[in-house]
Amino acid sequence: GRVAGATVNDVLVGAVSAAISHYLADRGYDPADLSTMVPVNVRGLGQPLPRELGNKFALVMLPLPTSRLAPLQRLAEAKRRMDSIKHSPEAVLTFGLLTAIGRANTAVAKQLIDFFAAKAIGVTTNVAGPMAGRHLAGTRLTGILGWVPGSGAQTLGVCIISYDGVVRVGFKADASAVPDADKLVHAFDDEMDT
């Protein structure tokens, strides 16, 4: 993750972007940039945890650098785009919008959610899990993996999760849009090996 001042998350987002690019190119598509939604925490870092735990995040559009780029160019672009989200008011504005949608009647809320969901291919999330191993019913957990929910007709969910010093990446794909998702996973693995 030291290349171009990038974080581990930047490297993984770049690799996901490259995998999508290669997957589409192998099927004869010109891989223009595609957007995914990424959750952004809107709870202040210094805020104490509330009595009742819960998430306080907004889904923000992240244009993935899926067009044809060299690996280091793609990494630099992934970092630039991720940094842009971190310094944008979009998360706070989106959180307010999602809160308002949640208060609308069900039919209106569904239409609005479907409208916004159609702007992205899916959701990509990075979850920092426990840094040390955990036990469940006396047995040490060897790994954990999460699955990303999707909305509307979104076709691809990517969950990046770290646990006990290991990062795992899970892909969830709509079989009608990505009938050979294993090839997308192999493209990701190949990208991580370069």
Q: Which positions does each model-derived feature cover?
A:
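Glycine-rich, charged/polar anion/phosphate-binding loops
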Residues: 22, 44-48, 106-112, 143, ...
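Low-complexity, glycine/alanine/valine/leucine- and proline-rich hydrophobic stretches
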Residues: 118-193
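Generic, well-ordered alpha-helical scaffold segments in large soluble proteins
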Residues: 3, 14-23, 63, 81-85, ...
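A generic structural motif
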Residues: 4-5, 63-68, 173-178
